[in-house]
C-alpha cells in the first residue's frame, strides 16, 4: 500500500509489465482493481515469520477475493502442504509460497508435492 501508484508505475514500466499490489482486506482489493493493477496478493492468509507483525487475514478474505476479484489473485502467507487444500477450497486457484519450499528438507520434492496438489 505504500508503493508507487499503479498509474505512475505503468508510466515508468510501460504497458507490457505486470503491476500488482499486496492487499489485506476487500476494500484494498477493490481499490487495486480501480487503480488498474494486473494482479493482487491476498494475505497473509496465515501467520508467517516472513511478515512479522502482520495479522493474518484468514480464509474468509481469500473466499471474498475468489468471489469478487476481476483480476488474478495469489493467496500468500503461511501456506504449506498441510493447509493448501483449505486455501484451495475457498476458490483460490493460485498461491505463493516461500517457507514451504525454502525450509523443506528436500525443496525440489516439496515444490513437486505442492504443484501436484494444485493440479
Regions found by a protein language model. Name each.
Residues 1-11, 41-53, 84-117:
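Glycine-rich phosphate-binding active-site loops on the catalytic face of alpha/beta enzymes
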Residues 22-51:
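Histidine/lysine/aspartate-rich catalytic loop segments that bind and position anionic ligands
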Residues 21, 35-39, 78-81, 86:
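Electropositive, surface-exposed helix/loop patches at the edges of structured domains
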